[in-house]
């Protein structure tokens, strides 16, 4: 939950309603099937599924829903430095697509979900545009600060 909370925070920041729960592809398979197969009916637009180790959850969720699924590989205590999770989510068979973000990158999963939703919701699209503008300004401020401390002799 510590990793996945970053996605929830992004969605809240963008004003997107969300549903946060815990399901397991291995320990609660019927709960996972019920959750994923009813998600569109409940009004969800995108599912973000985080998993560690064998990381079957995102793929299994994608197999029973028509919604876009974003997989977040999570480095767990028994993982192979997270590579098992990354590869499990990346290597999906044709017909069961899962968008995959970097290891523990739930924030990017939230941003990707917001961009998907923003393609059909002008309010969310505006918030995403502002988010990107804010990031641009932050980088420009850092560059200006560095340049003032370390002037570049090759600038024109």
Where do the protein language model's features map onto the residues?
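Alpha-helix C-terminal capping segments
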Residues: 10-14, 59-68, 92, 118-119
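Short secondary-structure boundary/capping elements
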Residues: 3, 27, 31, 53, ...
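Short, ordered loop/turn segments at secondary-structure junctions
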Residues: 23-25, 52-53, 74-77, 103-104
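Glycine-rich phosphate-binding loop
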Residues: 35-74
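C-terminal binding/interaction regions
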Residues: 1-2, 6-7, 81-156
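Glycine/charged-rich beta-loop-alpha catalytic/anionic-binding loops adjacent to active sites
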Residues: 14-19, 43-44, 67, 90-98
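Glycine-rich phosphate/diphosphate-binding loop of Rossmann-like nucleotide-binding domains
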Residues: 1-30
């Amino acid at each position: 939950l510590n990793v996945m909370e970053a996605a929830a925070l992004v969605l809240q920041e963008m004003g997107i309603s969300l549903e946060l729960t815990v399901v397991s592809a291995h320990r609660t398979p019927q709960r996972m099937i019920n959750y994923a197969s009813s998600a569109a009916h409940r009004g969800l637009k995108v599912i973000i599924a985080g998993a560690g180790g064998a990381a079957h959850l995102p793929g299994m969720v994608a197999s029973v829903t028509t919604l876009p699924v974003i997989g977040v590989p999570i480095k767990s205590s028994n993982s192979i430095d997270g590579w098992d999770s990354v590869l499990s989510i990346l290597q999906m068979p044709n017909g069961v697509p899962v968008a995959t973000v970097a290891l523990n990158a739930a924030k990017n999963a939230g941003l990707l979900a917001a961009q998907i939703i923003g393609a059909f919701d002008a309010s969310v699209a505006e918030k995403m545009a502002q988010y990107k503008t804010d990031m641009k300004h932050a980088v420009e401020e850092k560059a200006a600060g560095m340049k003032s401390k370390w002037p570049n002799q090759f600038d024109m």
